Amino acid sequence: MSKIQSFGSGVYELELTVPVRSTKFQPGQFLHLTLDDFDPTSGWWPESRVFSIASEPKQTFVTIVYSVKGNYTKRMEDELVVGKKIWIKLPYGDFVIQEKDTPLVLVAGGTGVSPYWPFLLKPRETGAVHLFYGVREENHILFFDKIQILKSQKWFHLHLMVENGSVKDLPYKAGRLSVSEIKNELGEKFDLADFYLSGPPVMIKTFKNDLTSLGIMDSKVHIDEWE
């Protein structure tokens, strides 16, 4: 464990140095993390939790973000300190963001923004990527510095929704993120876009149903589901 950053309200960013030359995964995939001892010769993997990878591939570290919501993540909050050695395994998942000629709409609620960063940090010159990001308040905005850098890129379009309070140095709207808000912002591009959904399960279910009701085909809606 090389870095721990707290965002308040039980939300943390962790940076883990890995004992390999570089990490290999595709943007959108996740890893398993366990707090318990693991013997690679036993073939038995202990209890663990899964977290989206928020750093770029081919690095000597991986970054994840988690929110304290149960006994295991409470253990993480209590037990993880800089310098502690823990076991992870990766990569997993098929929530892989594909480059397309059509607009890409990345929808994130809270820590659900994490799997998008390996994709957003890739250099690109063309295309249109819309990040619709909903948070409760300013201090819950993850990767604030990276967003500030990206907002100057012509291909990147930030749509930040904040439920409480105001935000300095980033454009935002007050309120809760919704499919109707996304449709209003995209206009005629709405029917052409591919949608990626990441966030709390209730949010994902609601957004998926709302997109379907507006005529968006299932093949154009991609959900961050961990199995």
Enumerate the predicted regions with their spans:
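A short, basic/flexible loop-to-alpha-helix module at the beginning of a structural domain
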Residues: 89-101
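Ferredoxin-reductase
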Residues: 1-84, 136-137, 162-164
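Histidine-anchored nucleotide/phosphate-binding helix
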Residues: 113-124
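Short, conserved phosphate/pyrophosphate- and ester-handling motifs at nucleotide-, phospho-/glycolipid
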Residues: 28, 112, 200
